[in-house]
């Protein structure tokens, strides 16, 4: 049986660094909620069996009417960290018939620049891989190490062989679930799915990502994201 594809969007964060009282995934960019662009990209990929959005149990900002016409499901099972939210979402995918051998693509809600083309490029590159992998970009900037709390450069770090991780991150549901459970048992709260897979002793692959697929994090990021998204909206 051919493994199926599922998408998982952890959306339980508060976006504290974005400088807004409204979680960043619900901020309006180019006429739509930021989250809309992420959901629309996966909705355009009809090969996915389901897209599951994981919300915080007490989320009062989500309004399904803002995403009318898009195919996705919502479960209010978010945890206290990204890792916990992803784990709960993986467990929730079983409700939609997902098995351990099916693929899941975990994507940050705050990366609205994702495109169906990039999603399909990742799937095509990894669908026969025994582990899976992520989209990422080679580090282009010079890296400086600065001690915590300071502002003086301690040294320059080599950027050779360094890649900046993005999402989606694509792994078998069972492998990712077991890797996260192991990390939790051993007291590690990891910031992305590939880290959990690495912790379990596997070697994920990298697939070339895109500059437009950046994570909206700080207040100044919204203007850049809006410019990119507005251009795409006008082009369509």
Curated annotation (Swiss-Prot):
The record marks 159, 215 as: Positions MEP for the nucleophilic attack. The gene is ispD. It catalyses: 2-C-methyl-D-erythritol 4-phosphate + CTP + H(+) = 4-CDP-2-C-methyl-D-erythritol + diphosphate. It comes from the Bacteria. Transmembrane segments: none annotated. InterPro entries: IspD (IPR001228), IspD/TarI (IPR034683), IspD/TarI_cytidylyltransf_bact (IPR050088), ISPD_synthase_CS (IPR018294), Nucleotide-diphossugar_trans (IPR029044). It is an enzyme of class 2 (transferase). GO terms for biological process: isopentenyl diphosphate biosynthetic process, methylerythritol 4-phosphate pathway. This is 2-C-methyl-D-erythritol 4-phosphate cytidylyltransferase. HAMAP family: IspD. Catalyzes the formation of 4-diphosphocytidyl-2-C-methyl-D-erythritol from CTP and 2-C-methyl-D-erythritol 4-phosphate (MEP). Gene3D superfamilies: Spore Coat Polysaccharide Biosynthesis Protein SpsA, Chain A. GO terms for molecular function: 2-C-methyl-D-erythritol 4-phosphate cytidylyltransferase activity. CDD domains: CDP-ME_synthetase. Its EC number is 2.7.7.60. Belongs to the IspD/TarI cytidylyltransferase family. IspD subfamily. Keywords: Isoprene biosynthesis, Nucleotidyltransferase, Transferase. Disulfide bonds: none annotated. Pathway: Isoprenoid biosynthesis; isopentenyl diphosphate biosynthesis via DXP pathway; isopentenyl diphosphate from 1-deoxy-D-xylulose 5-phosphate: step 2/6. The record marks 17, 24 as: Transition state stabilizer.
